[in-house]
């Protein structure tokens, strides 16, 4: 018999011949679609490690998958060759399912005046690190080539952000055996993904760290919180919904399920794991951050993204509206951010993190998944007992 010590009723004696049902089990039975989605994903727990381009690693994805969750590789800035290398590395470490994420984007052709103005704006910041800004050799990876690599690699899950696929592309991924997940920051975007045949929608609230995935309408209008976004998406589409944004522990997982989500995607929660790809300076910033230390900014990449406030964010705040759109600004600041990481300078790093950063835990990924699972089961029990 399992007791939940917070509930006084559970400590009272039972009449002979009676037994007390497991509240966690009872709640799970009330969420049958959760088990259905987990079966489709091929995982035991409703925990998905968020794809974090530049910060995740094959070791992180493999550890999460091996622990019963779903590990993800953020491939938005990986070349097709690097995508293949990363996928092979995951498969060498685990035979469990994993996913890969791409940015749906077109390669830009910015005018020279825009590029030159942006480089001049960044020159003082480069100078602080003893460097001069240089024009990048490419603005971004070619999405068409990345997509072909994704189809060939056949991960269990293919997820997308920044834009939307067409129905033919979704059909190709289905033929390759991939479950297609589309990121939505609004109800309209969730409906759009359902209409092109996506299997799952990831509803990403404004609390989430890193880049906003908005592709319909204005970024400002799309700043809907997870608590408001998830149930509206659940009601709007007939496909499963994954909740993302601000979820850091098992209580958040249970809360998301209570809203109708069938799993959660957690990025910031896994950033401090030793398997992640961030450097010492970034780790120190995470350890010191509080709940009020993040905000959305365009200064690093040209696309709104949530990160820990630092000197570069503040220095360019007045110029934010003039920053060229992603991926141009992202490419122009790339060398600066790499140099800052090498020099241990948090002042010039894009310290992507969500509003839950104050609750980050520096645990090995597999151990963190186990802790999250225990917390989730306990929270399910509390919800069942309160019902």
Enumerate the language-model features and the residues they cover.
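Active-site entrance/lid segments in N-terminal catalytic domains of soluble metabolic enzymes
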Residues: 31-236, 372
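Conserved active-site-proximal phosphate/metal-binding subdomains
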Residues: 211-216, 220-242, 247-387
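Short, Lys/Arg-enriched N-terminal segments with co-localized hydrophobic residues
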Residues: 19-32
């Amino acid at each position: 018999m399992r007791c939940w010590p917070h509930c006084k009723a559970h400590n009272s004696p039972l009449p002979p011949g009676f037994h007390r049902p497991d509240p966690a089990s009872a709640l799970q039975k009330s969420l049958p679609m959760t088990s259905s989605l987990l079966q489709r994903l091929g995982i035991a727990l409703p925990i998905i490690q968020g794809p974090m381009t530049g910060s995740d690693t094959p070791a992180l994805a493999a550890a999460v998958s091996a622990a019963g969750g779903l590990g993800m590789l953020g491939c938005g800035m990986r070349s097709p060759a690097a995508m293949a290398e990363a996928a092979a590395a995951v498969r060498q470490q685990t035979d469990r399912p994993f996913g890969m994420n791409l940015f749906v984007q077109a390669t830009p052709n910015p005018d020279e005046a825009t590029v030159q103005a942006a480089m001049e704006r960044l020159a003082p910041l480069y100078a602080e690190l003893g460097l001069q800004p240089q024009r990048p050799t490419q603005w971004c990876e070619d999405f068409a080539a990345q997509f072909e690599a994704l189809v060939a690699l056949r991960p269990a899950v293919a997820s997308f952000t920044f834009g939307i696929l067409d129905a033919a592309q979704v059909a190709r991924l289905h033929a390759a055996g991939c479950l297609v997940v589309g990121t939505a920051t609004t109800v309209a975007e969730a409906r759009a993904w359902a209409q092109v045949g996506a299997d799952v929608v990831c509803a990403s609230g404004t609390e989430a760290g890193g880049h906003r995935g908005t592709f319909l309408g204005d970024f400002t209008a799309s700043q809907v919180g997870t608590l408001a976004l998830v149930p509206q998406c659940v009601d709007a589409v007939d496909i499963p919904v994954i909740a993302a944004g601000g979820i850091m522990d098992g209580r958040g997982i249970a809360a998301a399920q209570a809203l109708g989500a069938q799993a959660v995607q957690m990025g910031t929660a896994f950033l401090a794991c030793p398997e992640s790809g961030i450097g010492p300076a970034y780790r120190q910033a995470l350890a010191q951050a509080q709940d009020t230390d993040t905000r959305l900014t365009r200064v690093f990449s040209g696309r709104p993204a949530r990160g820990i406030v630092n000197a570069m964010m503040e220095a360019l705040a007045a110029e934010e509206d003039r920053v060229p759109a992603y991926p141009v600004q992202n490419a122009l600041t790339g060398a600066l951010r790499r140099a800052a990481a090498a020099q241990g300078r948090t002042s010039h790093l894009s310290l992507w993190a969500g509003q839950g950063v104050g609750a980050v835990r520096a645990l090995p990924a597999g151990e963190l998944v186990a802790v999250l699972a225990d917390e989730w089961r306990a929270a399910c029990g509390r919800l069942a007992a309160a019902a």
